[in-house]
Every structure is written in C-alpha cells, then in structure tokens.
Amino acid sequence: RGLGDVYKRQIKDGRYLTNKARGVGVYQNSDNMLNLKSFEAGLTNLSKEQFPTKSYVFREGQILSKDTVENWLDRKTKDNPDGLNPEDNGKKEADKRNPIYVQQIEEQDYMQEKDGKLSLAGVTIGIGMNQKDYYQKEEYGATYTTDISTEKMKEEGQKAAATILARLRQKSEIGNDTPILICMFKQAPNDSLVGGSFYAYALSKNGTSISSWTDTDIKSVVLPATDSSSVPNENDATSFSAFMNKTQSFFPNLAGVTAQAQYKGKELQGMHVNITTQFYSMTEITSFTQFVSQMARTYLPSGVPVDITIKGSDGTVQAFLSRDSGQNSYYTHVFNSY
C-alpha cells in the first residue's frame, strides 16, 4: 500500500509516543483479533475526514491512561463508580443477566503546529459495542452467549458516548473547545472471519451535548459468500469466485482462498485476500505469485485497493501482492530465507 494519505507521527525526544492505554485493546479482543485491526484502521480512516492528513499530525492517545480505560470498560460497582457497563445483577440466564455492552475504547489525538510547537487540535474516540456478550456461569466452565439487539446496542452506545464526552471535557488538555469525534463500532462475533465495522459517528465541536449522529453505512463481508445476496454488489462476489476457481485449478496444493471486502453502501472500498498454500520450494512460490498477479488483474475488481497475502500452512507469510486504487498492476514481493 502506498503511503500517500497518511499522518505524520509525533516523535518526542527522538522516541515514538506509544498509546498510554496500549495493550488494553489486545486483551479486549483476544478472541477475535480481526476486531482490533478493523477498529484501529477504521478509526483512522474516519478521522481523516474530520482531521485531514495535510493539516494535522497524529499522536497516539496520551490523555486516557490504561487504568482509566480499564475502569471505564469494567462493570459499575461501589469500588468502580466509573464503569460504563451495568453492575452484575447476579443472574446467570442469557436473557436475564446484565451483559457487557461496551467492549473497547481507543483514543487518537490530532495535533497542529503553532509557533513551532505542536498542540492538541482534535481528539477521536472509538467505542466498540457488543452484539454478543460471552460469559461463563462458573470459572473455567462452558461459554454461554447473551445476544444484544441492534436497537439496544445503539441505545447503550449513545449513553456511553455521552458519558465519555462529558469526562473528556473535564480533562485540562482537552477543555471545552477541542473538537471531539466519537465513532461507534459494532464488534464482530468471536467466530467471525471478518472484523466488525463502524456504524455511526458524531462530532462535538464544543461542550458536552451531541446534536446528531451520522450513519456510516460501512459493512465488512467474507468472500466466497455462502449467500451472494449478503454481498452489497453481487458482481464482486462473482468476480472473486472466478479468481478463486482459476487460482485453485491452476495449482492443486492450495488449502484455501478467502477475502475480506469492505463496503460503503454498495460501493466496494477495498479487499484483502488470503491464500493458504502447501508449497515448500522457492520456485513454486515465485511461479504461483506471478500467476496470482495475472489472475488478480484479470478478475478482481479494479479502482479499489487490494492486498493479497500468500501464507504457508504453518502461517508463515510467503509472498505479498498489493495494488493501490489508481493502479492497474500489482506490486509483488516474495519472501526469501537467507
């Protein structure tokens, strides 16, 4: 992927500033790391519309500490009055217990230069909401699931957003007038082959009220699709199936060809293809990579960014192909071992 539309990063005293709540997201998404990838990438993309890369410098979140975020994500108790999730009502039945609604929170800071100094000019907060809450009735016991309706998820998300906004306004570095972009994310279930997606955002230019929410209309789908009607554009599903069939028929030693595609409405925004092989020789991998490049140019949708990762059955990345939205040909790289 080209590095055209990316933020400059803030470096302080020759060191990169890591997020103060670093590691919380990994723990919160340990059962489906695709959620974390989709969450972080999507959050930065939504921020670009509000805080353009030409005018702002990116800083990892420095205002919310790890302890603060962990307390907010926990249940509300006497010892933790700041918990955004409801207190445990003691019930064990899936439809009677109080589920965990808010699963993850991430802060991103956007800086601008004034008089040779960088100062905070905007904050983005991502809030990840559960559609399913997984729990055990006893320690180390079986895992059960509470389903959360879309309506309830959105209602609890707006409550959490209002509380977080009010708390951020009390932070001295943010104050009353720093724009805060709040982005709402729907977590994918643990067994999903794609990460979740952002469903709404709101901008607070100042104060603690959120005047309106904007729907993103973003959706992630897995290809090949078991039901083509679940893909916003059926032509993309057909194109991918042709690519998959050609690729698999040419090389018999393939374990699988899948893709994650992201849509905004019916418009494809990008695609990441994963191919698992059982190749061992360098010549096989190189020949296969050349073939995949030709098939991708022929069959995969044009005009959008596409990444293709070729992995061995042990998970080792053997080759990588990439094409930006304005390009026809693919950049390819085969990983040698020395």
Q: Can you annotate each of these PLM segments?
A:
Residues 2-7:
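Short, small-residue-biased leader/transition segments that mark boundaries at the very start
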Residues 128-132, 185-187, 278, 313:
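Solvent-exposed coil/turn segments that connect beta secondary-structure elements
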Residues 228-233, 240, 244-338:
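Hydrophilic extracytoplasmic domains
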